[in-house]
């Protein structure tokens, strides 16, 4: 019997750049399939940007056939207009997944950072570095846009929440990176 396979799509919503990452999981082993950004800066009209988000997310879903979507929740430190636009962008990405019957899980930015680095206040660079080490991503595959690794981080966070030893055993959550390494020595070298 082959190990269970699934594909997790992670999304970091944005109205200028929207990051995404695709994670292929076989059994309990994740592997990077793809990551990238959807560039929206050339569109002046917000509604055209929303259509572009829907079209590109739908295209990625049709290309990679994810089983689940993990999406970062909007950060509440921005102004009201920014929050409204970001919420619309997130909603359109979610609608694209729902149109293809893909279940969605939303994670707070702090929760994603905590899951990846053990520190809910980690920088984008720290998150990217930890993902690169954990998934063994070669330097040439790393993108300069941190939105891509933020999207991938949402997928990896979802993997940890649904596939890790604590998810299977119903035990307590991993508290930090050291705790994760101690519980998962086979995942880190």
From Swiss-Prot:
SUPFAM superfamilies: Ribonuclease H-like (SSF53098)
Enzyme Commission number, as recorded: 3.1.21.10
Catalysed transformations (reactions): Endonucleolytic cleavage at a junction such as a reciprocal single-stranded crossover between two homologous DNA duplexes (Holliday junction)
Active site (record annotation): 12, 72, 147
Superkingdom assignment: Bacteria
Cofactor(s) required, per the database record: Mg(2+)
Name recorded for this polypeptide: Crossover junction endodeoxyribonuclease RuvC
UniProt binding sites for Mg(2+) 2: 72
Cofactor note: Binds 2 Mg(2+) ion per subunit.
Quaternary data: Homodimer which binds Holliday junction (HJ) DNA. The HJ becomes 2-fold symmetrical on binding to RuvC with unstacked arms; it has a different conformation from HJ DNA in complex with RuvA. In the full resolvosome a probable DNA-RuvA(4)-RuvB(12)-RuvC(2) complex forms which resolves the HJ.
The keyword Magnesium is assigned to this record: yes
HAMAP family per the UniProt record, alphabetical: RuvC
Record GO terms (molecular function): crossover junction DNA endonuclease activity; DNA binding; magnesium ion binding
Protein family membership: Belongs to the RuvC family.
Broad class of the protein's primary localization: cytoplasm
């Amino acid at each position: 019997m082959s190990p269970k396979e699934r594909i997790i799509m992670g999304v970091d919503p944005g109205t200028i750049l929207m990051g995404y990452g695709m994670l292929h999981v076989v059994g309990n082993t994740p592997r990077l399939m793809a990551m990238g950004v959807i560039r929206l800066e050339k569109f002046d009209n917000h509604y055209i940007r929303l259509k572009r988000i829907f079209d590109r997310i739908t295209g990625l879903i049709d290309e990679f056939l994810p089983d689940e979507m993990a999406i970062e929740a909007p950060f509440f430190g921005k102004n009201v207009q920014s929050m409204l636009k970001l919420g619309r962008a997130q909603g359109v990405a979610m609608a694209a997944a729902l149109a293809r019957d893909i279940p969605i899980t939303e994670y707070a930015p702090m929760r994603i950072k905590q899951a990846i680095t053990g520190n809910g206040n980690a920088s984008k660079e720290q998150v990217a570095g930890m993902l690169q080490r954990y998934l063994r991503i070669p330097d040439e595959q790393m993108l300069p846009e941190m939105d891509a690794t933020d999207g991938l981080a949402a997928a990896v966070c979802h993997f940890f929440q649904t596939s890790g030893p604590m998810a299977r055993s119903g035990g307590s959550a991993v508290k930090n990176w050291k705790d994760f390494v101690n519980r998962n020595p086979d995942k880190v070298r």
